[in-house]
């Protein structure tokens, strides 16, 4: 495999097939200027999983070069319809599914496609395409070729909705986007929608059972002022969300979205300034790029509530009362929105006081007894509201090199939550 020399950056790039083993590559030919020597010689074996330095000397002059191996990759990395609707990519089966509203004319949709560097794609990106039937896309890059089948599914009346501040799913932060992608792939007849779309009535929610909002913000969201400053789009959609709730729709609020029951008037003490308007009173969070590394499984407690739907079929650990959610080396921001319980501070001396004042039912607890999972039961014609504010509830790890076991409980618990809320 010949190297391509870039003199401007003093880089040599050796392209190899996608499946080629680059752990020990032999230098079979190295041509230098007359009189020059190098610390890398023909016959040397190089570990090309990382770039290698080459020091070349000629008399009093020397230059450092970098040699790197680049595998021929032919992948579609993102597929977006009309600048809004993101496709879910199944890399194993080379399929892409895009869910769009029924109102779109699928005979003329424009996909924007991101694919591997140096590759070509056919049909081309940004060309109006008829998606009445599945469309095949072929990506080619030197020795690598991949063929993807793209299917567009129209949804007239979604059964479930993931809402967010962003106008399209690809603009969500990576934590939110990971959660949303899971929903689109695992909850039937589901869609992503922005709060603006909800506010404008762009979607027919007459058959929607559940609206989910998983709200992440680096550094945390603590208190009513901080929440309202961080999520003005959500507040603008309150009238429509209240109507949805009154007509029997249910909510799943996770992480900092657990402040929403106060804004919607679902929490009974939503007007009590001294009780933080019924919002979680103990909130914090880290930054995704500097996320903490788990030394082992993290967990919260479900003591007394193991029979609740949300806790069924979980991956079990040593403690029967624990819900384990992370694995060793998982990176987590520990983004938390919980209720501190105690006579020392926070306004809720005990669980009975919290229940009476908020109208909530506590379902999960932190190590210090804080309430980290709770629900507000249906009243009259309204739906139910389920909240998860535990810092252990986390979808994305910046480090993917961990062995997943307990983290599977995040998806299991969320699927259980949908089943619980959709079958009230």
Language model region names:
Residues 159-161, 386:
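Conserved beta-strand elements of the Class I
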Residues 223-328:
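A glycine-rich, often tryptophan-bearing local segment used as a flexible ligand/cofactor-contacting loop or short
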Residues 172, 393-411:
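A short acidic/glycine-rich loop-to-helix N-cap element
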Residues 287-390:
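Catalytic beta-strand/loop cores that center a nucleophilic Ser/Cys/Thr
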Residues 167-168, 217-218, 258-259, 368-369, ...:
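Short, solvent-exposed loop/turn segments at secondary-structure junctions
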Residues 416-424:
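C-terminal alpha-helix
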Residues 1-159:
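Beta-rich interaction/scaffold domains
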Residues 161, 165, 169-270:
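Helical hinge/lid and interdomain linker segments adjacent to catalytic or ligand-binding clefts
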């Amino acid at each position: 495999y010949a190297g391509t020399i870039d003199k401007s950056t003093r880089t040599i790039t050796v392209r190899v097939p996608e499946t080629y083993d680059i752990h020990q590559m032999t230098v079979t030919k190295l041509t230098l200027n007359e009189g020059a020597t190098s610390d890398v010689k023909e016959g040397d074996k190089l570990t090309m999983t990382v770039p290698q330095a080459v020091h070349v000397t000629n008399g009093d002059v020397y230059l450092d070069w970098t040699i790197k191996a680049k595998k021929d990759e032919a992948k579609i990395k993102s597929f977006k319809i009309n600048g809004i609707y993101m496709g879910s990519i199944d890399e194993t089966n080379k399929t892409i599914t895009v869910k769009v509203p029924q109102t779109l004319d699928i005979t003329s949709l424009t996909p924007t496609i991101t694919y591997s560097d140096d590759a070509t794609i056919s049909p081309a990106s940004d060309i109006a395409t008829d998606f009445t039937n599945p469309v095949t896309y072929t990506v080619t890059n030197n020795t690598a070729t991949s063929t993807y089948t793209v299917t567009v599914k129209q949804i007239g009346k979604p059964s479930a909705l993931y809402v967010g501040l962003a106008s399209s799913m690809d603009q969500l932060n990576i934590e939110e986007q990971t959660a949303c992608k899971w929903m689109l792939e695992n909850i039937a007849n589901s869609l992503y929608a922005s709060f603006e779309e909800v506010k404008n009535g762009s979607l027919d929610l007459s058959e929607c059972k559940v609206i989910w909002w998983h709200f992440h913000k680096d550094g945390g969201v603590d208190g009513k002022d901080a929440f309202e400053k961080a999520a003005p789009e959500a507040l603008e959609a309150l009238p429509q969300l209240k109507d949805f709730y009154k007509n029997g729709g249910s909510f799943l609020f996770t992480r900092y979205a657990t402040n929403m029951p106060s804004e919607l008037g679902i929490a009974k003490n939503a007007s009590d300034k001294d009780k933080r308007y019924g919002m979680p009173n103990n909130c914090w969070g880290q930054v995704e790029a500097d996320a903490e590394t788990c030394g082992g499984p993290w967990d919260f407690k479900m003591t007394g509530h193991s029979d609740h739907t949300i806790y069924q079929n979980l991956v079990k650990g040593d403690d029967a009362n624990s819900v384990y959610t992370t694995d060793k080396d998982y990176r987590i921001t520990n983004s938390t929105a919980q209720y501190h319980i105690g006579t020392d501070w926070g306004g809720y001396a005990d669980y009975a006081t919290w229940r009476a004042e908020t109208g909530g039912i506590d379902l999960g607890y932190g190590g210090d007894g804080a309430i980290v999972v709770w629900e507000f039961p249906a009243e009259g014609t309204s739906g139910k509201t389920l909240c998860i504010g535990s810092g252990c509830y986390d979808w994305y790890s910046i480090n993917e090199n961990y062995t997943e076991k307990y983290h599977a409980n995040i998806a299991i618990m969320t699927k259980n939550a949908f089943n619980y809320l959709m079958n009230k």
